[in-house]
Amino acid sequence: GHMRNLCLEDSLIRLMRRAYGQEKIISTTFPGDVGTHVAKCLWYIKNHISEYEFKQRSEAEDRGEWLGQMYSAGNLKLEDEASIPEQFEQNKKELTAILKQLEMQSGEFFDLWKETRQWSVDLMNKVYQWADVSFDRWYWESEVDAASVETVKKYYVEGKLQKSEGAIGLDFSESNLGFCLLLKSDGTGLYATKDLELARRKFEEFQIQKSIYVVDQRQALHFKQVFKTLEHLGFEQAKDC
């Protein structure tokens, strides 16, 4: 799926640059370098991989691929232990603590994240070089993570968003799009929160007139909600996303 989207977006960029000019088309990417999937990988490495093995892996050429294996192993381990109430709660607390460290940018898991994140970046660059694909701007999920929550709070204070059962978002039931949840009742954000902030940055940083998202069809409802929210917040460009 990732390779299909990569080929599709690169083809679109090349075609549009031939039609409209190199300088009028801006290519961007949005790698997910934080989130539960990252926390699971870090959790498994810290709890189930020896320092010796980690050091050996850190010097190996396939260390990027190894991280993918660690995520899969961590996911399976957590699923196996989910049936044990005490262990489930303990693991849940540890994952929450990991995500908190990444958000605060401090702690042993943040240090581990910085090192292993670079492995992933190196692998991505290697793949992109092989595929002859490049981007004008890399937006990182970690770059918009905390800022996205503050942006939603700001719009809520301005009266542009609404609260429902402690959560913040917008109700688009009349458009058959349901409720676009932007902040959960515990104050944490979601993918829509980050996509809202990402779009805001692209609109304001590049003053773009049209934004094309190359994503899976299964994300159609999600992005319809995000674009509708952006329109509501005054971003007219969202009508042409």
What function would you assign to each model-found segment?
Residues G1-C241:
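NTP-dependent nucleotidyl-transfer catalytic core
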